[in-house]
């Protein structure tokens, strides 16, 4: 499968990521889900967690971002992820990602 989908992770301050991908996985309010090219259109609320972007290999994530809650708009050709915070954790260890996630969840709970 050579088809790709454009994925953008957008924060109030910047576009954290803008790349063509073969697949993207993320944490919705109802659980983890994946998006492939030609996906049916949808809008989904996201919870704090990982967004994994698969560029060349659908079995190995090549870009991983930790996001705060947000919303994603999916069409057949693109995925827009709007979030307050996006941290590139591609080269972090699992322990470092877990620590960052706990810190982010604490910050979010302190705001509410």
Curated annotation (Swiss-Prot):
Entry's Pfam families?
Answer: ATP-synt_DE_N
| SUPFAM superfamilies cross-referenced by the UniProt entry | Epsilon subunit of F1F0-ATP synthase N-terminal domain (SSF51344)
List the subcellular locations.
Answer: Cell membrane
First-listed, main subcellular location of the protein, grouped into a coarse class: membrane
Q: Which keywords does this Swiss-Prot/TrEMBL entry list?
A: ATP synthesis, Cell membrane, CF(1), Hydrogen ion transport, Ion transport, Membrane, Transport
Q: How does it sit in the membrane?
A: Peripheral membrane protein
* GO CC, alphabetical: plasma membrane; proton-transporting ATP synthase complex
Q: Which GO terms describe its molecular function?
A: ATP binding; proton-transporting ATP synthase activity, rotational mechanism
Q: Which HAMAP family match?
A: ATP_synth_epsil_bac
Q: How does it assemble?
A: F-type ATPases have 2 components, CF(1) - the catalytic core - and CF(0) - the membrane proton channel. CF(1) has five subunits: alpha(3), beta(3), gamma(1), delta(1), epsilon(1). CF(0) has three main subunits: a, b and c.
Q: Which family does it belong to?
A: Belongs to the ATPase epsilon chain family.
* Task performed by this protein: Produces ATP from ADP in the presence of a proton gradient across the membrane.
Query: Protein name, please?
Result: ATP synthase epsilon chain
Organism for this UniProt entry? Rickettsia africae (strain ESF-5)
């Amino acid at each position: 499968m050579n088809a790709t989908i454009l994925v953008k992770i957008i924060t109030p301050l910047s576009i954290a990521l803008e790349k063509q991908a073969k697949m993207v996985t993320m944490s919705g309010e109802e659980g983890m889900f994946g998006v492939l090219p030609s996906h049916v259109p949808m809008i989904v609320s996201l919870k704090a967690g990982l967004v994994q972007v698969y560029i060349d290999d659908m079995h190995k994530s090549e870009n991983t971002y930790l996001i705060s809650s947000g919303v994603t708009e999916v069409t057949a050709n693109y995925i827009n992820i709007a979030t307050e915070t996006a941290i590139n954790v591609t080269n972090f260890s699992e322990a470092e990602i877990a620590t960052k996630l706990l810190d982010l969840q604490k910050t979010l709970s302190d705001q509410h």
